[in-house]
Amino acid sequence: MATRVEEAARGRGGGAEEATEAGRGGRRRSPRQKFEIGTMEEAGICGLGVKADMLCNSQSNDILQHQGSNCGGTSNKHSLEEDEGSDFITENRNLVSPAYCTQESREEIPGGEARTDPPDGQQDSECNRNKEKTLGKEVLLLMQALNTLSTPEEKLAALCKKYADLLEESRSVQKQMKILQKKQAQIVKEKVHLQSEHSKAILARSKLESLCRELQRHNKTLKEENMQQAREEEERRKEATAHFQITLNEIQAQLEQHDIHNAKLRQENIELGEKLKKLIEQYALREEHIDKVFKHKELQQQLVDAKLQQTTQLIKEADEKHQREREFLLKEATESRHKYEQMKQQEVQLKQQLSLYMDKFEEFQTTMAKSNELFTTFRQEMEKMTKKIKKLEKETIIWRTKWENNNKALLQMAEEKTVRDKEYKALQIKLERLEKLCRALQTERNELNEKVEVLKEQVSIKAAIKAANRDLATPVMQPCTALDSHKELNTSSKRALGAHLEAEPKSQRSAVQKPPSTGSAPAIESVD
């Protein structure tokens, strides 16, 4: 019998789970709403568990008192079971709150979020219909299981065993509920810690954004300064090139003038050289002529000497002739001397002309030296300009190096920005993982709450069965009214016991689902 009751409860729980899963697919709540609903439901479950512990002892005493009366009422058993099953359904309709019914109907009907909520009367009617269907099936299964037993003692023994099992299960469920409450408190603490870390990450993000903005502003100022410096350098370079071009043009004009003057001087020098050559040739010709004259005079002297020798021989014979010839020769000698002096004077004049030509040549050399000095000064100015140009080129190289350094700094800042963006993305990924963990924990909590509600319904059904058996045992109306009050208490207590019973499969599921949660624990540690 106990196995059949458990199978019926499992079938009821499977249907409720399917309905809740369908309700989840149709309607989703925000994490904050789920958290608030879960805390309220857990508070209600805790209260029901306390009431169940208080009522367990009173129910056991009532069962012992009514054993004798139940033994006598076996004849009217079947009719009373059917009547009390319907009465129990109607009583449970009144006990279930309309809000719970609406919530259960929303969870069972997929896509109920999109529909508008009907009025309270329609909600009650729908809840009652659903309850009649589910509870009627379970009551019929329990009654069939009890009908298989022959004697009422066996039925009572089976019910007592089932009740003891339910008590043990309720205690275990209470323990599990305490463990789950502790886990929930830990999860809430972790959630608060994660929220604080999220706020810290947002602050860090805002700081990084402000730093990026400051860097962009600094980069803009650096770019503007570099552009201004480049413009100033270009203006300076243009001015220097213009000044250099003007000086080059002036120097070229001076060089052209000097070339023209040098050409004139060269022509004059060529003409003077030709004149000097002509004078030298004339002087050479005159020297040759003078040499010839001297040779001729030497020959004449030789002839005179020969004549003198002859005359010496003929002195004696012709002293008169000799004297005459001597006078004649003296005259010729004086004439030749006069000619010699004239030739000397001509030579002096020619030497004077040569000195004049030499003076002119020296003046030409002085003019050439002056032109060379001007050329050297021009070369010095050119060297100065080249030095200035080299200095300007060095300055441009320095500015280029500064600009390259600034570009390198900008690239480094951009790399740092990319690294920080990667860190920010990693933090976002960690936050998404933590949000997934929170969602998974919330879904587990919702599943546990739904299972607790299913167990509550099972306990209420079992309480209805016990109340039906008690009504069969008591023929008098007064004990029946007392039993009704006990039934109401039993329903509340057995709901709590049902919550404990549902917590066992949930704990098993959580144990099955713990590996992914433990896998997510290193992610939380990495965030810390």
UniProtKB/Swiss-Prot annotation:
Phosphotyrosine: residues bearing it: Y283
Modified residue annotations for Omega-N-methylarginine: R12, R24
Any Pfam family matching the protein: Taxilin
Modified residues (Phosphoserine): S79, S86, S97, S105, S517
Region Disordered: start-end pairs: 1-36, 102-130, 486-528
Annotated Basic and acidic residues bias: 1-10, 104-118
Upregulating conditions: By bacterial lipopolysaccharides (LPS) in Hep-G2 cells.
One Gene Ontology term of the molecular function aspect: syntaxin binding
Major location category of this protein: nucleus
Keyword Metal-binding: no
Tissue: Ubiquitously expressed. Expressed at high level in heart and skeletal muscle. Expressed in brain, placenta, lung, liver, kidney and pancreas.
UniProt subcellular location: Nucleus membrane; Cytoplasm, Cytosol
Biased composition (Polar residues): 508-520
UniProt feature coiled coil, ranges: 153-464
Single GO BP term: regulation of cell cycle process
GO cellular component terms, A-Z: cytosol; nuclear membrane
Alphabetic keyword roster: Cell cycle, Coiled coil, Cytoplasm, Membrane, Methylation, Nucleus, Phosphoprotein, Transcription, Transcription regulation
Primary role: May be involved in intracellular vesicle traffic. Inhibits ATF4-mediated transcription, possibly by dimerizing with ATF4 to form inactive dimers that cannot bind DNA. May be involved in regulating bone mass density through an ATF4-dependent pathway. May be involved in cell cycle progression.
Summary of subunit composition and partner proteins: Binds to the C-terminal coiled coil region of syntaxin family members STX1A, STX3A and STX4A. Forms a heterodimer with ATF4 in osteoblasts.
Other comment: Depletion of TXLNG by siRNA decreases the percentage of Hep-G2 cells arrested in G1 phase.
Similarity remark: Belongs to the taxilin family.
Alphabetized PANTHER family for the sequence: GAMMA-TAXILIN, TAXILIN
Identification of the protein by name: Gamma-taxilin
